[in-house]
């Protein structure tokens, strides 16, 4: 019977290709069902572990009609001009409440608007309420939900402005908000003439201004006017009773953050001159402090236009950056200053310092931390405890130090490791809410903190809960996920009782929430029982018809000895005696500075078999063996740069994956396709140009000509002029004449990802066509870097499946050495 089920998947094929521009097409039902499957609800739990908010969506997709609504693309933003909010949102459509307890039932939230389109959900500081926004056809409104009554209501009719982010923040009293509202004085939108008033001119007077290839930039004075209009808002204090207190005049507000005690507001406002080279986050901005009564306190700094920031992942703007409030103090501002001018090339002992200023902000700032590398963040605990981190990408170094903010002279190193070393990642500290409703370190009376993490190991990911003593640096393991389940901690419900909330899953069991008791009662003289589990949610399997998909975690070696992994997916009912299958390799390369780190195992063999329509996994439903997430490490140890041998390592990694599938008897080396998205598309084109391993390729939303990203790409830090040979060798466009394998190119017509302009696929297709390659280009209208419309996703699967069936599944066999996996004519 199982064998029969397997052959059903194999026999479901694709009809002959439709003519070009024949409209949106549908894939076979096997694939279409993955797109239309009901999405699993998302869950948010209060910090006390008493209530969970269940958010439901009608669908995981949008529609092409929704995507085709008017949209402005300005300053790196995509704006819905009708609502002054972001375009392309996927909304929550229903809310329910549920007790975090056994046998609890969902409580339907009442008072929701008709046809709700909800987002930006936030618990109140005291967690008796939840706020959220609802987006109508013409504006964004604020609602509040009372937990005890499960009733929601609209707080005010005022329209919020979400162009520059979440348009409201709770104040610590849980009775009021700081909002960014649309002022009545904003008036009508500017009329934009189609007749230009003159040329658009940019000029540089001898200064270096290296920048990534940002998209959706301002292009002319008309764009400037529209950006300024739609981003304009007014900061106001809004009470739950609907009362309004203006805090600041009208302007382009990027940040409106209340202090933990609710007495002050940190306002960051953007002002001219705007830029045609960089996005809004680098525009000039002024950082001010106001009282929530509207009284001006101080201008902290006026930050200039940031067009000349040094290049590279270890670079930073010169001067002040990252202004925020200390979570553990009533009203203490902190920020970072670069002592090296933000230039990673400078040799200097201290690169960043962190300074603080206490209310009323009249005294001299206090330096509380000096970083030898780039500041990486801080987790506040109390006036004697904080965890500061530093990072340096060039060496992959990451350091965590224990600091006493009141006496910061002697920080203590807690962890010093490589960011690539997942096996020795200590995890992240658990947090709790303090008297202000802000999250801070959860420190026990004995000076311990709780650490939780993914628990990467040679056995795969095994999430854990540890107790770590800040004084002795000793770790005590409290719990670790055990086979055959993948279980990860969500929150610590009650440390004294040993109760934690977890999400638990297996290959065929959908993730659900459980209460795990780490200290279950035991009878006298008996060994401790397995920690008790209490299931809290019962979300169903999203596609039960594919429960039989088989999954196996593979481990194998590359020819240079680097350890590799992949997840092998096989169709339901498949048996080894059925013989090798047509196969599909789906991957995304990653750079490493250490071969040992590159070979570390990631993922877990016990995670739920989530068959996503987005990756190659979907084609396990169509009779293919899928090598999902095959590791493609690009290693450059010591002074060597990974990309200097990119092509060689790329081909060797792909060959090793195919060889392992052949060794297992499940992969037909004569019928293998390869695919990837974004940098995975770049990988795909390079593999087809530089090897004979594959019968066909599918490249979605990639960049193929690296001379169009001359100031670095992905994790390449060198510019084109520093490493022209590397850029050229890595560019599939430069090797279009070598392409002898069928390649399907798919791209969103409105891709706004840095580097992957749609013209990349257009020009690459033209080059391939000009050189006589077998290729096809599909542009998806209105789609960005990730496709969201149901029509687009279904058509994407139609194209991918048809391409694989024609050029891989039905490819004519050729001789191959199944012992080595080498194909005849391999380069």
Where are these regions (language model features)?
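Positively charged n-region of N-terminal signal peptides that target proteins for export
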Residues: 1-4
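Active-site-proximal cap/loop segments of hydrolase catalytic domains
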Residues: 91-96, 100, 600-827
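Short beta-strand element of the alpha/beta-hydrolase
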Residues: 570, 578-590
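Short hydrophobic segments within beta-strands
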Residues: 569, 586-587, 675, 746
């Amino acid at each position: 019977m199982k064998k029969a089920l397997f052959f059903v998947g194999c026999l479901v094929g694709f009809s002959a290709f439709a003519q070009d521009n024949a409209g949106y097409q549908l894939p076979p039902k096997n694939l279409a069902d993955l797109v239309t499957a009901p999405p699993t609800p998302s869950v948010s739990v209060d910090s006390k572990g008493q209530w969970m908010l269940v958010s439901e969506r009608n669908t995981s997709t949008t529609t092409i009609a929704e995507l085709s609504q008017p949209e402005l693309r300005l300053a790196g933003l995509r704006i819905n001009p009708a609502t002054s909010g972001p375009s392309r949102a996927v909304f929550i459509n229903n809310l329910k409440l549920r007790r975090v307890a056994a046998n609890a039932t969902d409580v339907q939230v009442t008072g929701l608007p008709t046809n709700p389109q909800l987002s930006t959900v936030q618990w109140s500081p005291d967690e008796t309420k939840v706020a959220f926004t609802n987006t109508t056809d013409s504006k964004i409104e604020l609602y509040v939900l009372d937990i005890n009554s499960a009733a929601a209501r609209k707080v005010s009719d005022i329209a919020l402005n979400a162009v520059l982010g979440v348009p409201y923040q709770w104040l610590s009293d849980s009775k009021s908000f700081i909002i960014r509202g649309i002022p009545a004085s904003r008036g009508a939108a500017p009329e934009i003439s189609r007749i230009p008033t003159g040329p658009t001119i940019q000029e540089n007077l001898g200064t270096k201004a290296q920048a990534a290839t940002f998209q959706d930039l301002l292009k002319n004075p008309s764009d400037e006017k529209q950006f300024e209009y739609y981003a304009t808002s007014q900061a106001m204090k809004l009470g739950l009773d609907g009362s309004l207190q203006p805090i600041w005049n009208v302007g382009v507000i990027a940040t409106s953050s209340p202090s933990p005690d609710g007495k002050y507001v940190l306002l960051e406002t953007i002002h001219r001159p705007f830029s045609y080279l960089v996005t809004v986050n680098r525009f000039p901005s002024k950082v001010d402090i106001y009282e929530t009564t509207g009284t001006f306190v101080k201008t902290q700094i006026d930050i200039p236009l940031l067009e000349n920031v040094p290049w590279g992942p270890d670079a930073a703007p010169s001067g002040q950056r990252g202004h925020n409030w200390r979570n553990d103090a009533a009203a203490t501002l902190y920020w970072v200053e670069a002592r090296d001018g933000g230039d990673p090339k400078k040799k200097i002992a201290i690169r960043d310092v962190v300074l603080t200023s206490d209310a009323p902000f009249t005294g001299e700032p206090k330096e509380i931390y000096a970083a030898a590398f780039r500041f990486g963040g801080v987790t506040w605990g109390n006036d004697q405890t904080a965890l500061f981190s530093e990072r340096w990408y060039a060496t992959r170094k990451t350091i965590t130090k224990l600091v006493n903010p009141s006496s910061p002279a002697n920080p203590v190193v807690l962890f010093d490791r490589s960011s690539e070393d997942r096996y020795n990642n200590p995890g992240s500290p658990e947090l709790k809410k303090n008297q202000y409703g802000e999250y801070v370190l959860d420190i026990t009376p004995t000076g311990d903190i709780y650490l939780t993490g993914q628990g990467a190991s040679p056995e795969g990911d095994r999430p854990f809960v540890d107790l770590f003593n800040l004084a002795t640096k000793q770790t005590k393991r409290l719990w670790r996920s055990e086979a055959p389940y993948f279980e990860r901690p969500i929150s610590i419900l009650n440390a004294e009782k040993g109760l934690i909330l977890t999400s638990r899953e297996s290959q065929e069991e959908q993730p659900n929430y459980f209460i795990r008791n780490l200290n279950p009662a035991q009878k006298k003289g008996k060994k401790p029982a397995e920690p008790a589990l209490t299931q809290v949610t019962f979300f169903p399997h999203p596609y039960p018809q594919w429960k039989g998909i088989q999954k196996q975690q593979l481990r194998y070696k590359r020819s240079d000895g680097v350890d590799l992994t992949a997840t092998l997916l096989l169709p339901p009912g498949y048996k080894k005696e059925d013989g090798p299958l047509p196969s599909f390799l789906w991957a995304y390369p990653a750079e490493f500075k250490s071969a040992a780190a590159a070979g570390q195992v990631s993922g877990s063999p016990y995670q739920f078999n989530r068959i996503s329509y987005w990756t190659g996994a979907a084609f396990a439903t169509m009779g293919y063996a899928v090598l999902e997430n095959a590791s493609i490490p690009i290693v450059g140890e010591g002074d060597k740069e990974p990309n200097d041998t990119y092509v060689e390592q790329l081909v060797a990694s792909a060959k090793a994956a195919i060889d392992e599938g052949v060794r297992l008897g499940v992969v037909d080396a004569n019928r293998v396709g390869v695919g990837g998205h974004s940098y995975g598309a770049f990988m795909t084109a390079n593999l087809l140009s530089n090897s004979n391993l594959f019968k066909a390729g599918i490249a979605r939303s990639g960049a193929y000509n690296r001379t169009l990203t001359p100031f670095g790409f992905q994790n390449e830090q060198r510019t084109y002029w520093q490493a022209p040979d590397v850029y050229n060798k890595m560019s599939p466009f430069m090797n279009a004449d070598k392409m002898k394998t069928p390649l399907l190119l798919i791209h969103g017509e409105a891709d706004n990802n840095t580097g992957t302009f749609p013209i990349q696929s257009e020009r690459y297709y033209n080059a391939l066509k000009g050189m006589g390659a077998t290729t096809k280009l599909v542009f998806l209208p209105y789609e960005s870097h990730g496709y969201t419309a149901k029509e687009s996703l279904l058509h994407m699967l139609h194209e991918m499946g048809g391409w694989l069936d024609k050029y891989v599944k039905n490819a004519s066999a050729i001789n191959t050495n199944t012992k080595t996996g080498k194909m005849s004519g391999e380069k």
